[in-house]
A protein has these predicted regions:
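Active-site metal-binding core of divalent-cation-utilizing nuclease and nuclease-like domains
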Residues: 104-106, 212-235
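A short, surface-exposed helix-loop junction/capping segment
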Residues: 179-190
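A mid-sequence, solvent-exposed acidic-amphipathic segment
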Residues: 188, 192, 196-224
Length: 235
């Protein structure tokens, strides 16, 4: 069965079942990163969810920026959206900001405030909004999100030009921070060759099943003059 889904922004499970898909198909598509369950009984294609989430969250960031006091830097999932990194809806259910201070954060209905040290080099401007740098954003996500989500964001950041050296320097500054062990594990697992969110998620799933790390974008050569698409090679 082809996995090209002829669907609008949102499609109910019953509609997909009527088109010939079964529950196993939907689970495989969800695990592979092609489908996202936006709520019980409703799905959307992953890239469409990304677009919907980004547009909605950018509006929230703008509205929040007009009301925040000075010193609040957009961070975590909010910074990921501003940098163009893939995010899951739950990662941006609230607008995330970090203030340069130690101590516990504050979670409100719309805004979650994190308290953590912030160096000047860890703050950039995107569309005139103060946002944590790409390095700091990836590390904050790696400390706080499930590994599949953190790896998907980190792989994209490497593709955008972020280096492992930058991530390593950032990790040194986070010694003893909550979640830093998980962040180190995520950083070690990142692969610039990953070409999609689904590919990043699949690598994590393979690792969690105890399978060897795949060789990405492996060129399969045949005796025939036919070009085969690049893919995984499991050792």
């Amino acid at each position: 069965m082809s996995w090209a889904l002829p669907m609008d922004d949102i499609r109910l499970t019953r509609s997909l079942l009527e088109q010939g898909y079964n529950y196993g198909d939907l689970r495989r598509l969800e695990r592979g990163g092609e489908l996202v369950r936006v709520r019980r009984g409703a799905y959307a294609r992953a890239h469409e969810v990304d677009q919907m989430v980004e547009k909605r969250h950018r509006r929230l960031v703008l509205a929040t920026a007009l009301q925040l006091r000075d010193g609040a830097i957009f961070s975590h999932g909010s910074a990921a959206v501003m940098h163009g990194l893939p995010v899951w809806p739950e990662a941006v259910a609230r607008v995330h900001v970090t203030r340069n201070r130690r101590g516990s954060g504050i979670k409100r209905s719309v805004v979650q405030v994190h308290g953590a040290p912030l160096l000047p080099a860890e703050i950039v401007l995107i569309d005139n909004f103060p946002v944590t740098s790409l390095t700091r954003t990836v590390l904050d996500l790696a400390r706080t999100l499930p590994m599949t989500q953190a790896v998907a964001a980190g792989d994209r950041a490497l593709a955008l030009g972020l280096s492992r050296k930058q991530l390593g320097v950032g990790l040194l500054a986070m010694e003893r921070w909550p979640g830093v062990r998980t962040a180190r594990r995520v950083v070690e697992f990142l692969d610039v060759r990953s070409e999609s969110v689904g590919e990043s998620m699949s690598r994590v799933c393979l690792m969690e099943e105890g399978l060897p790390r795949p060789d990405l974008q492996y060129d399969l050569r045949t005796r025939r003059p036919t070009r085969c698409p690049r893919g995984f090679l499991l050792g």
